[in-house]
């Protein structure tokens, strides 16, 4: 997708940069970071991340720095207006989701309710 089109989900430079490095380590340029939502966690829904070399029908792919972020349509409805980022800090390094649709989140930030 073009950078000048309003996207429903932001893929930050930090996240794209980390994905680029991780894909280079795997030596598979077809890999993309997939973000998804599943039921569970202490708040009802939880975020998941995996590397995937398949893009399914209906998936949205957001390209940045030559790498892709893939989201299935069911998960995207909960993520509209949000951002996938990468952070490094005292608690470790990880991909995170900033989600304006979440009414509450758990302390670790990996689960939420709407």
From Swiss-Prot:
GO biological process, one term: iron-sulfur cluster assembly
InterPro entries assigned to the protein according to its UniProt record, in alphabetical order: FeS_biogenesis, FeS_cluster_insertion, FeS_cluster_insertion_CS, FeS_cluster_insertion_RrpA, HesB-like_dom_sf
UniProt GO molecular function: 2 iron, 2 sulfur cluster binding; 4 iron, 4 sulfur cluster binding; iron ion binding
Gene3D superfamilies assigned: HesB-like domain
Keywords noted in UniProt: Iron, Iron-sulfur, Metal-binding
GO cellular component, one term: cytosol
Residues the entry annotates as binding iron-sulfur cluster: 42, 106, 108
Cofactors that this protein relies on: iron-sulfur cluster
Co-factor binding comment: Binds 1 iron-sulfur cluster per subunit.
Tagged with keyword Iron: yes
Subunit organization: Homodimer.
HAMAP family, per the entry: Fe_S_insert_ErpA
Function description: Required for insertion of 4Fe-4S clusters for at least IspG.
Record NCBIfam families: iron-sulfur cluster assembly accessory protein (TIGR00049), PRK13623.1 (NF010147)
Family: Belongs to the HesB/IscA family.
Protein name as it appears in the record: Iron-sulfur cluster insertion protein ErpA
Species, as recorded: Klebsiella pneumoniae (strain 342)
Gene behind this protein: erpA
């Amino acid at each position: 997708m073009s950078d000048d089109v309003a996207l429903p989900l932001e893929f930050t430079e930090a996240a794209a940069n980390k994905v680029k490095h991780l894909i280079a380590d795997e030596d598979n340029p077809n890999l993309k970071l997939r973000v998804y939502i599943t039921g569970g966690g202490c708040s009802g829904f939880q975020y998941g991340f995996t590397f995937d070399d398949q893009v399914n029908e209906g998936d949205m792919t957001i390209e940045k720095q030559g790498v892709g972020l893939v989201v299935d349509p069911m998960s995207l409805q909960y993520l509209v207006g949000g951002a996938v980022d990468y952070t490094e800090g005292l608690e470790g390094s990880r991909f995170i989701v900033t989600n304006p649709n979440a009414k509450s989140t758990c302390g670790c930030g990996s689960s939420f309710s709407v």
